[in-house]
Amino acid sequence: MIVRRALALAALALAASPALAAQERPTIVVGSPDFRPLPIAVAAFQGEGDAGVAATQTAEVVRADLVLSGLFDVLDPRGFLADPSEGFAAPSIRFARWADVGADGLAKARVRRGPAGLEGELHLYEVRAGREVLVKLLRVDGADARSLAHRMADEIVRYYTREPGIFATRIAAIRRGRGTWELVTQDMDGGNQQVLLSERSILMSPAWRPDGREILVTSYRSGRPELWAYRFSDRAFRPLGRHRNAFGGVYSPDGSRIAFTVSEGNVTDLWVMSADGVGARKLTSDPAIDVSPTWSPDGRRIAFVSDRSGTPQIYVMGADGSGARRLTFQGNYNQTPQWSPRGDLIAFTARDERKVFDVFVVSPDSGAINRITQDQGRTNEEPSWAPNGRLMIFRTDRNGGIQLVVSDARGDRQTPVTSGKTDLAAPAWGPLAP
């Protein structure tokens, strides 16, 4: 039975792609003048055996993910007209009924418990063409319906955009407790939060290694700021480099180097070293304060904050420290730059004369600025980009307590991904899931 099911899936996948799907395959082009969210129906998922609850949870999270992406108009399942018992083969599906509720796309799935965890068999259809275009068998360890749903949503996004989805990614952040600082991670939508470290000393500025195997943080274990790395494989937490008073470290896009800040006496400069903590050398030598480095996606440039002009502003220089130039000229307090993985924007936090913090983006080439938040609480800060460069996450107090919000790159859609009051700081969006 298992062999027949596997062969059937292989045959369906072969039939669905690439030749069939290439026929007038719809593509969502984000940023195009005629962009509109694609109407999609996510039918009730079928649970096999005792997987009924998991199937329901998986479908709910898939719908929420697709809404969060901003790419889809996810239709309300209460308005569906199709027979819930219809099958998965295209001839058994009454596409006209799905078209009648406005669907262009249709997602269905089977969920079951496998030998090592949950398995999901995702089926995707183009309703107007009346054809099945994608079949994918996905597995996750344990009984984690959320992880299975995130991977299904990633496959749907990949089909329609030809880009990897980001729902299976993780967010790292620092949580302040009573006398403790915790390094935590969570799903990008706020679920599955896990505590990696709990320290009696200050933790700051988490930054992911590009392969997702480690998180770099600033630790005050010794009483002074130092760079430490948390390794997922064995949960080791170790110092990196020999600099004391070092903080704000970030990996280069290829993972080979770390840019960081060192404060020595009255001098605060940027440094760079290899990822194993050796070969450190100074990048800036200026009487001003230089902090908060962030790499361009090609690794050739670094943006940073400096007060060399009299107030904190965003600057850009070569990765070797050469050719520093001022990028921002609006506002008197600009900080926490984060370079988009697409290379076209740098997100940052600005404080105005009312001491209100808001998130902005600036072009690293032209210097053109666009505002992301305005009159949404007194604090919107610490933006971090998703690996696709289309979404960002930041910290806000807009609803009376600290929350994390996911926004698109224009600020048009902003969605809280943590509920209630949470003391999370310095969110850092992790790399694509392997």
Swiss-Prot record:
Annotated Gene Ontology cellular component terms: periplasmic space
GO biological process entries: cell division; protein import
Signal peptide (UniProt feature, chain positions): 1-21
Keyword Signal: yes
Residue ranges of the region described as Disordered: 411-434
Superkingdom of this protein's organism: Bacteria
UniProt keyword Cell membrane, yes or no: no
Subcellular location: Periplasm
Keywords linked to the UniProt accession: Cell cycle, Cell division, Periplasm, Signal
Family: Belongs to the TolB family.
HAMAP family: TolB
UniProt function note: Part of the Tol-Pal system, which plays a role in outer membrane invagination during cell division and is important for maintaining outer membrane integrity.
Subunit structure: The Tol-Pal system is composed of five core proteins: the inner membrane proteins TolA, TolQ and TolR, the periplasmic protein TolB and the outer membrane protein Pal. They form a network linking the inner and outer membranes and the peptidoglycan layer.
PANTHER family: PROTEIN TOLB, PROTEIN TOLB HOMOLOG
Name of the protein described by the UniProt record: Tol-Pal system protein TolB
Species per Swiss-Prot/TrEMBL record: Anaeromyxobacter sp. (strain K)
Gene responsible for this protein: tolB
